């Protein structure tokens, strides 16, 4: 249960060096502890059927450690026993027109770039299968999706009979599923032994040097520079800047063929090919470890002010009896409410995903409402968990006759 959460603590400069912790990304001994939030839900997207179950959801501690050898950041208190991804894990984003356009544009680019026509495609961490099925539709491809939370049949498509879903965690036992193209989107940040994971993919590919590997994760440079505390939560135990990601790929036997940002710089994307010996090529986006250290210092110096400002605003709106709603019930919402310890300041949370409606948010206990709920509620303010969706939200509100102020994070 989330209660009496200690205030997040940002340590001076790089934070205290913790010599007992080993970086899972490069093996270096010693991490600098620079940010702590205690007693947060260990999952953000497991949908709870009742408020009681949601309130009594297990909690853990979030303690970020920075590696001054490779630039990687990890939650040193992360315990993999809580990695209970299952069909009730609901992170499907394809109900958003904005996200759909991004996914379709990305898929079209990959199909064109790698000539993905009549090919075998593997997706590690495929969620409900939206992106894998899209790739198979666009290029008449065959697909295998590996994810413990997959729900076969959730996505209707003419390509469904060409896609096989395996409801398991990816491991070396899946080496036979390699194909012509491997993709992995928003999965690596949930895995703490990151070097081991990337190496497992490389070993699975073996000598098939034409197999490309595409991976997409959150861009931690933006998180640090923008003080995006809502993107720091227990499920995400691994945080990558572009340089840290490229370095672990090279160390695992991949040549980086492209490295870039997308989705308003929120996402970090990497493309790679297996090689015996990597080159010395460095991409412009790659920062040095010293630059990551400066971003960490910026975060520690300024995060408390941002958190205090949000607390003051929420308290002020509550005192004024303003109706304040959160739009977006996923991980950002859970991090926002629990980090600030202001669950009581928000009455309702809405979400566009119909599979979330009526369910309860883990650790928070709020029931998730559909956007149509706002027609009657008529909120004074809507706090938007991701500003990239403001335009589509405003359009929906106008169609529903809801006049309110959008407050993006």
Sequence positions of predicted segments:
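Hydrophobic, well-ordered beta-alpha structural blocks that scaffold small-molecule cofactor pockets
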Residues: 109-110, 116, 134, 271-409
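Short, glycine-/aromatic-enriched active-site segment of Class I SAM-dependent methyltransferases
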Residues: 42-45, 213-238, 242-246
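A short glycine-rich, Lys/Arg-flanked "PGG" loop and its adjoining helix->strand segment in the class I
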Residues: 195-212
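Extended interfacial segments that mediate partner engagement and assembly in macromolecular machines
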Residues: 55-155, 167, 233, 238, ...
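Conserved SAM-binding strand-loop segment of SAM-dependent methyltransferases
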Residues: 159-172
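A conserved beta-strand element that flanks and buttresses the S-adenosyl-L-methionine
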Residues: 183
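A SAM-dependent methyltransferase catalytic signature shared across enzymes that methylate proteins
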Residues: 25-32, 242-259
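N-terminal juxtadomain amphipathic helix
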Residues: 5, 9-95, 260
